[in-house]
Amino acid sequence: MRYETVIGLEVHIELLTETKIFCSCPTEFGGEPNTHVCPVCLGLPGTLPTLNKKAVELSVRAGLAAGCEITRISRFDRKNYFYPDLPKAYQISQLYLPLCRNGSVTLDSGKIIRIKEMHMEEDAGKLMHSPDDNRTLIDCNRCGVPLLEIVSEPDMRSAEEAVEYLEKLRELMRFAGVSDCRMQEGSLRADINLSVRPEGEIELGTRTEMKNLNSFRAAERAIKSESARQISLIENGENIIQETRRWDDDAGMSYAMRSKEDTSDYKYFPEPDIPPVVVSTPDIEKIKNQMPELPQAKRRRWSEEYNLGRADIDTLMSSPFTADLFDRTVMLCKSAKDAASWINVELPAVLRGAGMSIEDAKFSPDSLGRLINMLSSGEINRGTAKKVFAKIVTENADPAEYVRKNGLSLMTDAAAIEDAVKRVIAENEKSVSQYRDGKTQAFQYLIGQCMRALGGKAPASAVTETLKRLI
């Protein structure tokens, strides 16, 4: 019998706010444990939450980016459960009236993955297990960090579709300016709801939820593993238990954590300390007008205006920084081909050599465009341009200023070039004679001698032209 895998995803993204959703504590990643906390996010008695307006605006922006309907009046609810990383013993979330509904993400195949809803909530803390002394430590810095939970419909049928959906969603949220979606820092986390059923069956099977997926590769492996596990249970006549499972990527397997809760288990009730969230039509229009160009539109424009291929576009779209760098560079240098080459080939090489990531690159986007113009005008050669570009990326150097200070400009004095070429001809009569006898390698040798005599500061085209004329 053939089986069909049915997959739905719950994706949590941390919103790009400077402070937490209900207090003024910073959201900065990587602080000393339990230093970004206050009585509000620790849930101490007598404290009251104050909603972060920026979190609401970013959530609306996310909904608009995914084509969602924006709920004009939404509400918060309390999700009650006990866990050591949840100081209040309840999480403020949205169940009954979420902020965004009915969006979608389109895969490359044209298949539409429906988004059921997006709702705001606060993050929990982080548990760190210490096997050496058998202790579990709690870091509450993450408590109260604003999250947007994006819940898909169970529209995906393979691990590949699920991973593509995650990639498309991450790209959309990053380019919309909603979240940095760094999985390694936990600002994008995905839970997988999965069941299997015989092909042609309408009724869904018993689902399990998979957690601890810290990469797209882990998500793909977990889906394939869980699908195979469930099919094996069915074929052996065993029942599938509705449960939450933890994925161990090193072992390539999952294990049961707890039975899967239903909504009723959390005893939701309306949050009494936060008034309804009202989003007016003018509010929505204002956010729409502030929206940047979204990935699908940007890809289409680059393809139509610049005739860029899919591979170049995919690489440029790997981060909002490189996409913005390309647009700014093309505006200055007017050559999409040159801009794409420098960003897709030279930039990664410089970053690797310096041990940097793209997030570490803080240079002005205008610098590359000006550097390409200096190269195309003959002011510098390509070797010099590469050296200058490395300084731009690693030290935010100004290209024109760096070239001037270090005397890297190419020689433009035709008389000086001619004098140097004449000296080389006089000193290399044998090579000149060989060239005149038809040995082209001798000409390349003479070019090299001329460039050496000029300290590498003359345009190769000018040296070649002068040598041909004088020989």
Model-derived features: positions:
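Core structural elements
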Residues: 186-198, 303-327, 336-354, 366-368, ...
